[in-house]
From Swiss-Prot:
<dbReference type="InterPro" id="IPR013709">
    <property type="entry name" value="2-isopropylmalate_synth_dimer"/>
</dbReference>
<dbReference type="Pfam" id="PF08502">
    <property type="entry name" value="LeuA_dimer"/>
</dbReference>
<dbReference type="Pfam" id="PF22617">
    <property type="entry name" value="HCS_D2"/>
</dbReference>
<feature type="binding site">
    <location>
        <position position="284"/>
    </location>
    <ligand>
        <name>Mn(2+)</name>
    </ligand>
</feature>
<feature type="region of interest" description="2-isopropylmalate synthase">
    <location>
        <begin position="87"/>
        <end position="349"/>
    </location>
</feature>
<keyword id="KW-0100">Branched-chain amino acid biosynthesis</keyword>
<dbReference type="GO" id="GO:0005829">
    <property type="term" value="C:cytosol"/>
</dbReference>
<dbReference type="GO" id="GO:0030145">
    <property type="term" value="F:manganese ion binding"/>
</dbReference>
<dbReference type="GO" id="GO:0009098">
    <property type="term" value="P:L-leucine biosynthetic process"/>
</dbReference>
<protein>
    <recommendedName>
        <fullName>2-isopropylmalate synthase</fullName>
        <ecNumber>2.3.3.13</ecNumber>
    </recommendedName>
</protein>
<comment type="similarity">
    <text>Belongs to the alpha-IPM synthase/homocitrate synthase family. LeuA type 1 subfamily.</text>
</comment>
<dbReference type="GO" id="GO:0003852">
    <property type="term" value="F:2-isopropylmalate synthase activity"/>
</dbReference>
<dbReference type="InterPro" id="IPR054691">
    <property type="entry name" value="LeuA/HCS_post-cat"/>
</dbReference>
<comment type="subunit">
    <text>Homodimer.</text>
</comment>
<feature type="region of interest" description="Unknown">
    <location>
        <begin position="1"/>
        <end position="80"/>
    </location>
</feature>
<keyword id="KW-0432">Leucine biosynthesis</keyword>
<dbReference type="InterPro" id="IPR013785">
    <property type="entry name" value="Aldolase_TIM"/>
</dbReference>
Length: 597
């Protein structure tokens, strides 16, 4: 038997807190911070120092039971229960990621993303906030009926109605989880909840007990945990564990923490929480200071065994911890972490591209792992080194994360059945024969223009076509653009609104401006253009262009996407797609207080 020095130090609040407490207790013979770090490094401490710790604990009114800190103690066997080297990946792209401005997805789009997340190997898929709106409930329920391997989860406040809606929504899933939360920081309890700490604990316990009526897999989150008082956190976490919570999530809701503090916080909290060794501890970090991934990794060092993250780091404000960076950090630096995930890393880039296509959020070229430049080398010295031996300048291979995914998919001679089968392989399932026929017709048109069609082309094509399937939408029909040097470009465009054909013309400072003005001359939406961007779907001059348009009106922000080998046609499609969402997709009546954790 051996003492767990890390837990022992954490019991006193961490290295710095312990050093200060020892100095106050015995100023002349106190151990220094450096000495305490050495205890942790060696995994042992002198008997004389152990006696001082015992005396310190007694002076604080909490006698030290050394049996609780023996390595073989039952409370430390969490490693055996949850496989200490196995990290659970909890993907919240469909819930927290969707809270990015304009990133709202349709039910069909969410199902496509969920299928890809299951293919990626995400252990938990947080499909949404079922009580937020009827649309959210339908999407969570549809995903619960679709996903068979991953656990499907719904978020809910610590309110009975929310929890019961979540329970009903995830009911069809073979593996289901309810994730309930309440704020625990002093500022949130006083100003947002207007509740006393005792009331917050009572609400949390009640919430967990109701959730257990629907599933044995219940996660509890302490919103704004990293700004909460740790003794109160230990109390509320202990109470919900006793009530039946199986995962405890500690969110850095406002991205306030820094890595070494995060690690210490987790160590101390786990040590102080009654029955803390009987649950999985989870980290949910936001990126306001650019430290979400670093804090997530630090939490794992501190004892967490679940991380909550999103594809491409998508999320409101500065985003969330990105799943691709966490997974590859654990894989590449296995020598330091010794931790494993169940992620198929070759699906990382396909997942990134799909989420980017559907949400309209392009990936920055220098983004780690999934950026277009992630494996590019401009320096001649670097290029020479990589050619001679890849590992001179690359710590992982492009193929290992799926950059070989530009696979030749289909050709102009491919038939309808081959097309349907390929869509199924990509996780794309169209709801009707009409939708399949429309998508296949678009594919044949594309095949006549483009010799090689890749998986990415099909994702872009289907996303574009699905947006046109709604009868209550703006639908692109055709356009003619006239430009001449020195003259204002003119756009003549034909489009449909609820099946009624409209014609419009306008001139502008450029062809894009002319297209937008022509559409607005009929639509009169009153929206403001926030973002217009164009990206090539694949390489080559005949590649499809994927265009994103972000429109804002009042407090609503929407993204529209269009894809075509003709960039100006893609531009018109994207603008019409955004207008469809703005005009015909009702704004979600979010439940009050249903913000991010």
């Amino acid at each position: 038997m051996q003492l767990d020095i890390d837990r022992l130090v954490a019991y006193f609040g961490g290295v710095n807190a312990l050093a200060e407490a020892l100095k106050r207790h015995d100023p002349e013979n106190a151990a220094t911070t450096a000495a305490i770090y050495k205890w942790r490094t060696r995994g042992s401490l002198p008997l004389a120092q152990l006696q001082k710790l015992t005396a310190l604990a007694e002076s604080q009114g909490r006698p030290l039971d050394l049996n609780a800190f023996l390595q073989k103690n039952e409370s430390l066997e969490r490693t055996e229960m949850t496989q200490a080297n196995r990290v659970i990946i909890f993907d919240t792209t469909l819930r927290d990621g969707e809270q990015s401005p304009g990133a709202a997805m349709t039910k069909e789009e969410k199902i496509r993303v969920a299928r890809q997340l299951e293919k990626l190997g995400a252990d938990i898929i947080e499909a949404g906030f079922a009580a937020a709106s009827p649309g959210d409930f339908e999407a969570v329920n549809a995903i619960a009926k679709t996903i068979t391997k991953s656990t499907v989860c719904s978020l809910s406040r610590a309110i009975e109605r929310d929890i019961r809606q979540a329970g009903k929504a995830v009911a069809p899933a073979p593996k289901k989880r309810i994730h309930t939360f309440i704020a625990t920081s002093p500022i949130h309890m006083e100003y947002k909840l207007k509740m006393k700490p005792k009331q917050v604990i009572e609400a949390a316990v009640k919430a967990v007990k109701i959730a257990r009526e629907y599933t044995d897999d219940v996660e509890f989150s302490c919103e704004d945990a990293l700004r909460s008082q740790i003794d109160f956190l230990a109390e509320i976490c202990g109470a919900v564990i006793e009530a039946g919570a199986t995962t405890i999530n500690i969110p850095d809701t406002v991205g306030y923490s820094i890595p070494y503090k995060t690690e210490e916080f987790f160590r101390e909290l786990i040590a102080k929480t009654p029955n803390g060794g009987k649950v999985v501890w989870s980290a949910h970090c936001h990126n306001d200071l650019g430290l979400a991934v670093a804090n997530s990794l630090a939490a794992l060092k501190g004892g967490a065994r679940q991380v909550e993250c999103t594809v491409n780091g998508l999320g409101e404000r500065a985003g969330n911890a990105s799943v691709e960076e966490i997974v590859m950090a654990l894989k590449v630096r296995h020598d330091l972490f010794g931790l494993e995930t169940g992620i198929d890393t070759t699906q990382i880039v396909p997942s990134s591209k799909l989420v980017s296509t559907i949400t309209g959020y392009p990936v920055q070229p220098n983004k780690a792992i999934v950026g277009a430049n992630a494996f590019s080398h401009e320096s001649g010295i670097h290029q020479d080194g990589v050619l001679k031996h890849r590992e001179t300048y690359e710590i992982m291979s492009a193929e290992s994360v799926g950059w070989s995914a530009n696979r030749l998919s289909l050709g102009k001679l491919s038939g309808r059945n081959a097309f349907k089968t390929k869509l199924a392989d990509l996780g794309i399932e169209l709801e009707s024969e009409e939708a399949l026929n429309a998508a296949f017709a678009r594919f044949k048109e594309l095949a006549d223009k483009k010799r090689e069609i890749f998986d990415e082309d099909l994702h872009a094509l289907v996303s574009d076509e699905m947006g046109n399937m709604n009868a209550e939408s703006y639908k692109f029909i055709s356009q003619k653009i006239s430009t001449e040097t020195g003259e204002e470009p003119r756009a003549d465009i034909v489009f449909g609104i609820k099946g009624e054909e409209k014609r419009a013309s306008a001139t502008g400072s450029g062809p894009v401006d002319a297209i937008f003005k022509a559409i607005e001359s009929v639509a009169q939406s009153g929206a403001t253009l926030q973002i217009y961007s164009v990206n090539a779907v694949t390489q080559g001059t005949e590649s499809q262009g994927e265009t994103s348009v972000r429109l804002a009106r009042g407090n609503r922000v929407v993204n529209g996407q269009g894809a075509d080998t003709d960039i100006l046609a893609a531009t018109a499609k994207a603008y019409l797609s955004a207008l469809s969402k703005l005009e015909f997709s009702a704004a979600k009546p979010k439940a009050q207080g249903s913000g991010t954790i």
